Amino acid sequence: QEGRIFKEMTAMRARGHHIEAICQPRALLVERLSDAGFTVHKVAMDGPVNYLKGVAAVRGILKEGRFDVLNTHSRRDTVIAALAARLAGTPLIVRTRHLSNKVGSMWSYTCLPHRVTTVSDHVREYLIERGVPANKVATVYSPIVLPPPVERSTLRDELGLADDDIVVGCVAVMRATKGHKDLIDAIVPLMASRPKLHLVFVGGGSPVFEQTQDYVATLGLQDRIHLMGMRRDVPNLLAGFDVFALATQQEASGTVYVEAQASGLPVIGTDVGGVSEMFRNGETGILVPPKNPQALTEALQRLIDDPALRRRMGDAGRKMVWEEAVFSPARLAETTEAVYWKWLAERAG
């Protein structure tokens, strides 16, 4: 969420809008936004005492600033800031839903905000099913900031792999729902007859990281399945892959698929959440049912055994991300601006 908020604020400011933030005092965004030149108001929101103080503080900030729009991003800040905005008379209150998991109480979507934005159509459709009117919720995809092209990845040198080895890579935090074991189980049947095939995981997270290490050791495939842990040079590592695959079981959107396509990689993803919206099935990648090892194995085999298909899908994905700019910060700002103007006009009625 923090990355999305920072990119959105930066992109909206670039279009000439005045943007300020209200954060908890110890929030990670405080320093980052301040360093970027944004005004950041620090308001404590924990506990019942701070709830009342928070409503009063935010109301004062909104009245003094005469803001047109308040955008909230979690239940707590919606309950406090949206109520404050109602009291301050802020014209438009928008709640953003970042996650795909089930929502308990819908109060912070249907009562406090005037409108809702989501990170994928999948999440939008879920909220509509739960009672948010369709005309009051819009999808605004999360953007990625494209890194400079990588001339040569260090991945293969680090792992001792040859240029003609085939590397299937996955970048994801190590959680059970990310499907690391599913990906292992799908690729292992292909390894015996393909001695140059390797699987690389990038990402950390206990206890799944250690459990995955143990599972790989049990299979005796430590020289074919590589766990690199958390890395800060993901674009460098993506440039060393031949195929990107993530067998996630739950995902609101999945911008890592976009990052992989930006690197010119064909992608394999599971048909859950908003994943199908992140790439074009059959054109830039292959979509498979979740928890279906055979389908995942078949998709992997198609791309592993067909270099021409890899190149064709990789080129199409790179074009979609770089030339069409579907997931650029500028596109996010354009979409956000459009829905805000539309909703402000409706509210002014």
Feature map (PLM): residue ranges:
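Aromatic "clamp/platform" in nucleotide-sugar-dependent glycosyltransferases that forms part
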Residues: M230, Q249
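A conserved mid-protein helix/loop that constitutes part of the nucleotide-sugar donor-binding site
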Residues: E2-T10, I166, C170-P189, L199, ...
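Short hydrophobic beta-strand element within catalytic cores of glycosyltransferases
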Residues: A21-C23, P266-G269, F279
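Conserved acidic donor-binding segment of nucleotide-sugar-dependent glycosyltransferases
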Residues: N281-G282, I286-P293, R302-P307
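A short, well-ordered alpha-helix in the C-terminal region of glycosyltransferases
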Residues: A85, D157, A295, R302, ...
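A short helix/loop element that forms part of the nucleotide-sugar donor recognition site in Leloir-type
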Residues: P149-L161, D214
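A conserved nucleotide-sugar
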Residues: G16-H18, A162-I166, H180, I184-H226
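A conserved, positively charged/aromatic
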Residues: L87-D121
